[in-house]
Amino acid sequence: MSRRHAAGKRVILPDMKYNSILLSRFINNLMKEGKKALAEKIVYSAFNKIEKKHRVDPYQIFNNAMHNVKPHLEVTSVRVGGANYQVPTHVDESRGYALASRWIINAALKRSEKMMIDKLAEELFEASNNRGVAIKKKEDTHKMAEANKAFSHFSPKKMK
């Protein structure tokens, strides 16, 4: 582990079409092997599909989906006296949106539609309506945190 100072957060430029940093982070998470143009094409095509099919603002659907999937609690593993405990902790906003985008992308990849554009469009629409696999993942995370509420006095920050 490095003894120098921690690396600073990198500045992410907002995307060109909607001027949104959150959407830019989502595109970066979707990107594989440095092919950002392809990731942008998939996201913007999914937005067009949402707009044509449901006649709603796709950027609003995206924001609702991210907000609905973003977890408020998660569990972290803490070792106390030779035993590991799953301790519920609050999720800060940055990590919450990172988890939400990861969960939406993974849920979209597992869908049965043929093209990624269709998969992403449907998963975003379902997540904005509090349905779908990504919402289930958030609920499972919250249930896990609720089940381990008894260990919340083991604060992960105090143990280190």
Curated annotation (Swiss-Prot):
Keyword GTP-binding attached: no
Species, as recorded: Rickettsia canadensis (strain McKiel)
Function recorded in the entry: One of the primary rRNA binding proteins, it binds directly to 16S rRNA where it nucleates assembly of the head domain of the 30S subunit. Is located at the subunit interface close to the decoding center, probably blocks exit of the E-site tRNA.
Cellular component per GO, a single term: small ribosomal subunit
Classification via CDD domains: uS7_Bacteria (cd14869)
Quaternary context: Part of the 30S ribosomal subunit. Contacts proteins S9 and S11.
Keywords: Ribonucleoprotein, Ribosomal protein, RNA-binding, rRNA-binding, tRNA-binding
Name the record gives this protein: Small ribosomal subunit protein uS7
GO biological process, one term: translation
Domain of life: Bacteria
Pfam families in the record: Ribosomal_S7
HAMAP family, A to Z: Ribosomal_uS7_B (MF_00480_B)
GO terms assigned for molecular function: rRNA binding; structural constituent of ribosome; tRNA binding
